[in-house]
Amino acid sequence: MAQAKLIDGKAFAADLRAKIAEEVAALKAEHGVTPGLAVVLVGEDPASQVYVRNKGEQTTAAGMYSETHRLPETTTQDELLAVVAKLNADPKIHGVLVQFPVPPHISQMDVVAALSPDKDVDGLTVTNAGRLASGLPALAPCTPTGCMMLIRDAIGDLKGKTAVVIGRSNLMGKPMAQMLLAADCTVTIAHSRSQDLPSIVRQADIVVAAVGRAEMVKADWVKPGAVVIDVGITRFPARDPEAAAAGKTRLVGDVAFDEVREVAGAITPVPGGVGPMTIACLLANTLTAAKRLSGIA
């Protein structure tokens, strides 16, 4: 059997960002509206700092207005919620994103509850989650939205396909399952405590791995020809000892890529698969929010 088709999330995301930039330019020219995204980061988490910097750069590159609020690790919950309230009320901001994780003394649930659902571009509020589950228009979480685009591009019509989502988080697993269900797939949500996980996964035409366990999904778990979407990211020291000593890392997904690509029909790499789609879909959500808040959409 031939190796799996490589799903190039980087190229797909670049095309999506170009389309968004065109729409942003048209929105400015026709309505005088510039979509604005504010990202709030609490603390010094290195991975979060990279994500936040990338979000800011890509927001600006798409022609949008970008704000980044960097708060110290010692910021209290009340101080953070005050920043969120200010951004909720700011007319030039259409999307508000608090970068998670936040320090342990701050409740992530309380932060999400404080976000205006109209500006909740991560799709985490109860309002947006409920709308998504009910099949109503919603600002949906960015990573599963990006995954759906890649799956549709790889397969086309999803009706009647069997899908297994490994992972049950509010940010990824649950909304991913809702989206696949809305596309008329038969969906199973599995997780690290599911019994006989390999046999569950082996039934699937579509596998979405989002559990955060490096290379957990092996070749003998995967049905020949299946589409495999790897959302997991685990950092390991670089293979080269000198690079590792210098603090360099390598990213590994939830799928044992080298062996699974010999079985699957299509597969996303890590990095370069799902990751670039997440920020592109964040920009798309910000554009949608700007249109809705301006009475255009």
From Swiss-Prot:
Pathway: One-carbon metabolism; tetrahydrofolate interconversion. Catalyzes the oxidation of 5,10-methylenetetrahydrofolate to 5,10-methenyltetrahydrofolate and then the hydrolysis of 5,10-methenyltetrahydrofolate to 10-formyltetrahydrofolate. Belongs to the tetrahydrofolate dehydrogenase/cyclohydrolase family. It holds the Pfam family THF_DHG_CYH_C. This is Bifunctional protein FolD. Coiled coil: none annotated. It catalyses: (6R)-5,10-methylene-5,6,7,8-tetrahydrofolate + NADP(+) = (6R)-5,10-methenyltetrahydrofolate + NADPH; (6R)-5,10-methenyltetrahydrofolate + H2O = (6R)-10-formyltetrahydrofolate + H(+). Keywords: Amino-acid biosynthesis, Histidine biosynthesis, Hydrolase, Methionine biosynthesis, Multifunctional enzyme, NADP, One-carbon metabolism, Oxidoreductase, Purine biosynthesis. The keyword Mitochondrion does not apply. Homodimer. HAMAP family: THF_DHG_CYH. The keyword Oxidoreductase applies. Its EC number is 1.5.1.5, 3.5.4.9. GO terms for cellular component: cytosol. The gene is folD. NADP(+) binds at G167, R168, S169, S192, I233. One of its GO terms (biological process) is purine nucleotide biosynthetic process. CDD domains: NAD_bind_m-THF_DH_Cyclohyd.
